[in-house]
Design a protein with these regions (language model features):
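Generic non-transmembrane alpha-helical segments
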Residues: 45, 64, 68-72, 271-282, ...
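Hydrophobic beta-strand positions in extracellular immunoglobulin-like domains
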Residues: 92, 253, 374-376
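Active-site-adjacent substrate-binding region
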Residues: 276-285, 306-310, 415-465
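Zn-dependent metallopeptidase/amidohydrolase metal-coordination segment
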Residues: 408, 434-503
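Acidic/His- and Gly-rich active-site-bordering loop/insert found
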Residues: 9-148, 168-186
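Acidic-enriched catalytic cores of C-N bond-cleaving enzymes acting on peptides and small amides
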Residues: 171, 178, 212-216, 225-234, ...
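C-terminal substrate/ligand-recognition segments
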Residues: 360-392, 409, 413-425
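Acidic/histidine-rich catalytic neighborhood of metal-dependent amide-processing enzymes
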Residues: 143, 149-238
């Protein structure tokens, strides 16, 4: 693997952006506490507005959001290009756009800040859940239900920030729907869209086409960064600066049809099994700039025991090379969910997901079809992904395997030295002086795959302070999805500080 370069650009971020104290520190504590609690109440309502995709029915959740925004005196816009697939947006005005109606919303100095979320959730089978996934159960200090983590909880945090900004306006005797929010230079846009879980074509892609002003901004913040992961007693806060793309393959493996009483090596299913084994082997670590900065941050902060396990992870070429990496080692080990995430983001991955073959129990299959889901790092092209697949299959099996790359979406990445990252680092460090802040590549896609190519830098930042024992990463699309009331309230304060740090006069 290629040696790392140093230092990373990201390591220089996080300077003190709040010399006069955090903006949230100037808010009446009673108000701050109330808004934090209301984030939990809002999340309960959003969970109960079941919006499983497919089919979506996001309009249910959109109507809840519209009502909550109207209670703040705002006049949100609604866009439903497909029946029951609703989208919502609202804008709070800053002084820059009020002074210059023709201001470019992507202007680096005065352009808008976009907070955006998706309204849909993945299905939730009741099996394995200890609560009804769509009841919005509140117990043990947590809000439980599908979407609590992905990502109605983050939307509730964003809504909490909007509530605080509206309170600023009302305290000055102003109308938050029409007047400039006191102290705000940039516009703040909150947009919630449909269909993220199945690609966004029926959601954010249509919004970009038909309601581009809902998204146009100097920078956007969305899901999946800023929450704590505890490793070897240290709190790590990954800030999402990039996300992997995807390449989906259909492999058709040929063999010879025959009677099962006379088996031989021409069995297509046997060949497919070999292909599965070869395809799924972890490839070499790819030190793209984002991964260089990530590993450098971990090396600088983690104790030797944890780093030893990380170094083994960097060197593995088969899953068996690091068979014990998922086991907890008190005082020395990284959290299992961190190791699994690192294994995924440090390289292009290839995961066999569907294998179909055979017609009867007594017939040797002459054909097998294998579906492979590949997730690719920034810089991996369609041609490179195809070439990698062919190389994995090997020259000996290549004559029997037809490789068809059926779908491709390039990875997206953003500058690691953007001003808003420094502000986010400062907001977290002001609360946690021992925080390990690092850039992260998401192993999955978000709606940033639409906004980044449209010229809107987009970072994953939905901050939560989590209990060290909480396996938050496993809650994404998992059973008993939940987030604590305390985490939501903390997230509202941190995100408010970031918004004001970036958008204030």
């Amino acid at each position: 693997r290629r040696a790392m370069s140093a230092p990373s650009r990201f390591a220089a971020t996080g300077a003190d952006h709040f010399p006069a104290g955090l903006p949230s520190g100037a808010i009446d504590p009673t108000l701050l506490k109330r808004i934090g609690a209301e984030a939990g109440d809002d999340l309960v309502q959003l969970i109960r507005a079941e919006s499983v995709n497919p089919p979506g029915n996001e309009t249910r959740a959109a109507k809840v959001l519209i009502e909550l925004l109207r209670r703040e005196g705002l006049d949100p816009e609604f866009f439903e290009p497909i029946p029951d697939r609703g989208n919502v947006s609202v804008r709070l005005r800053g002084s820059a756009s009020a002074a210059n109606p023709n201001l470019d919303p992507r202007d680096a100095r005065n352009g808008a800040l976009l907070l955006f979320a998706h309204l849909d959730v993945v299905p939730a089978n009741q099996d394995g859940w200890t609560v009804n996934p769509f009841e919005g159960v509140v117990k043990e200090g947590y809000i439980w239900g599908r979407g609590a983590v992905d990502m109605k909880g983050a939307l509730a945090v964003q809504l909490g920030v909007i509530r605080l900004l509206c309170a600023r306006a009302r305290a000055a005797g102003l109308d938050p729907a029409k007047d400039v929010i006191p102290g705000l230079r940039r516009d703040i846009i909150l947009t919630a869209t449909a269909d993220e879980e199945t690609g966004g074509l029926d959601g954010i892609a249509l919004v970009l086409k038909e309601r581009r002003h809902w998204l146009d901004a100097a920078v956007g913040l969305t899901e999946a960064g800023g929450m704590t992961i505890t490793a070897a007693g240290r709190r790590i806060y990954p800030l999402q600066v990039a996300e992997k793309g995807f390449a989906r393959f259909t492999l058709t493996v040929s063999g010879r049809w025959g009677h099962a009483s006379m088996p031989d090596s021409d069995n297509a299913l046997l060949r497919a099994a070999q292909v599965v084994e070869r395809v799924s082997v972890p490839g070499p670590v790819q030190f793209v700039p984002e991964n260089e900065a990530l590993v450098a941050a971990l090396r600088a902060a983690l104790p030797a025991g944890a780093m030893g396990r990380l170094e083994r992870l960097l060197g593995e070429t088969t899953f068996a090379d690091a068979a014990d990496l998922n086991a907890e080692a008190p005082g020395a080990g990284c959290a299992p969910e961190l190791l699994r995430a690192l294994r995924a983001v440090l390289r292009d991955t290839f995961a066999p997901t569907i294998l179909a073959s055979g017609i009867r129990s007594n017939v040797l299959p002459g054909s097998a079809t294998l579906t492979v889901d590949s997730r690719i790092l920034p810089g991996t092209t369609r041609e490179a992904a195809h070439r990698n697949m062919v190389e994995r299959i090997g020259a000996d099996l290549a004559p029997f395997v037809d490789v068809n790359l059926t779908e491709f979406g390039a990875a997206v990445s953003n500058p690691m030295d953007h001003e808003i990252l420094g502000i986010a680092c400062a907001a977290i460090r002001s609360r946690d002086g021992e925080a390990i802040l690092m850039p992260a590549v998401a192993p999955y896609a978000t709606d940033a795959k639409i906004t980044v190519p449209a010229g809107i830098p987009t970072y994953g930042f939905s901050p939560y302070l989590l209990d060290p024992k909480e396996r938050f990463m496993e809650r994404f699309h998992g059973v008993d999805e939940r987030v604590s009331q305390e985490a939501l309230a903390w997230g509202v304060e941190v995100l408010y500080d970031v918004v004001m740090g970036y958008a204030a006069e």
